[in-house]
């Protein structure tokens, strides 16, 4: 049998050209930390859910929040934010458990649009609630008749939820734009 084996006749790699050494091929990092399906992405989703649910519970625990439209808007926005974050946290847990990448173009588009919408709604609701809270506390001086501490706490928690949602949106949007 005349079969040639690599161990018998070793073949050397040709030397690299000068252009390949100067310009190495671009490597794309598909699973950067903070993206969907990573541990940091899961942590961001968890904190989004935690702070949005806390803002929702604190605001809903007051008896007079339905009388102000901005506070109703905050309850609706944080409710949507908490549901969205919880659903995507479950998707992240699944992806981490089965070691699956969530870098599908359609999924990233859905995540980017959903994160953009929910974070914008949460930010707008927190800003509106902050304006009403300042009006009640500073301008009208009627905190004795209202639940100002709960309003301020809920507004602060909504802002913190938005701060946790913003990196998720930026990572997804960056991943979508870099394709």
UniProtKB/Swiss-Prot annotation:
Membrane topology: Multi-pass membrane protein
Keyword Transmembrane: yes
Protein name: CASP-like protein 5A2
Keyword Nuclease: no
Span list, region Disordered: 1-24
Extracellular side: 60-70, 137-155
Family: Belongs to the Casparian strip membrane proteins (CASP) family.
Subcellular localization(s) per the UniProt record: Cell membrane
PANTHER family given in the database record: CASP-LIKE PROTEIN 5A2, CASP-LIKE PROTEIN 5B3
Transmembrane portions of the chain: 39-59, 71-91, 116-136, 156-176
Quaternary state and interactors: Homodimer and heterodimers.
Alphabetical UniProt keywords: Cell membrane, Membrane, Transmembrane, Transmembrane helix
Lineage: Eukaryota, Viridiplantae, Streptophyta, Embryophyta, Tracheophyta
All ranges on the Cytoplasmic side of the membrane: 1-38, 92-115, 177-179
Organism domain of life: Eukaryota
GO cellular component: plasma membrane
Principal subcellular localisation of the protein: membrane
